[in-house]
Amino acid sequence: YREYYISDKDYYCYRKGVFACHENITDSNGEQISNPYFADLQNGDIILTLSIHSLGWRHGHATIITDAEKGIGVQAVMVGEKSTYSYTSSWMKYPLVAVLRPKNVDKETRDAVALFAQQNLQGLDYSLLGGITSGRNAQKVPRATQCAHLVWYAYFACGVDVAPKSGLIITPKDLLHSESLEIVQVYGSILEV
């Protein structure tokens, strides 16, 4: 099983929106398939992929799990769309996926973060510059966000900084390489991208 999780997968790329391209895994016949499952998802976990790119930049995407039992998270998707819920099953199609969990953060805090995200971070406008105008010390919910900033803000609002070394714009790669987060599960060679 280990080899399946870390091996590279065949994939095809399709355009979503004006600039973004999404990679989906395929079988040997070119048919879309899914990774088997996520192990032990918990509220507050972060799922991210680096299988999304725009104009040559592999920026990726991230979501925060708000109801692990039902497989639901909250995400900011793209310009022109409001942040909304997502199903974890939609993340199974990507060839490069990681599940992250904050180090030294108890279940009670992660549950509070999930509840905060569910109640406060849906319906926000999307902004590529999410976080710049509100800053890293914002005390109120931002009006606009992007995927990694939404994840970061959910934790930050509850007293935890999951990307303390990131710059003004928090990216999925900042989350992936954050010393404050541990890897729970990976699909593909995401750590080599």
Task: Give, region by region, the residue ranges found by the protein language model.
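Secretory-pathway/luminal and periplasmic proteins that interact with or process carbohydrate-rich
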Residues: 56, 123-126, 160-161, 184
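Activation targets extended, charge/polar-rich intrinsically disordered C-terminal tails
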Residues: 1-19, 134, 139-193
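N-terminal accessory segments that precede or flank the first globular/catalytic domain
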Residues: 1-75
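Long, low-complexity intrinsically disordered regions
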Residues: 98-156
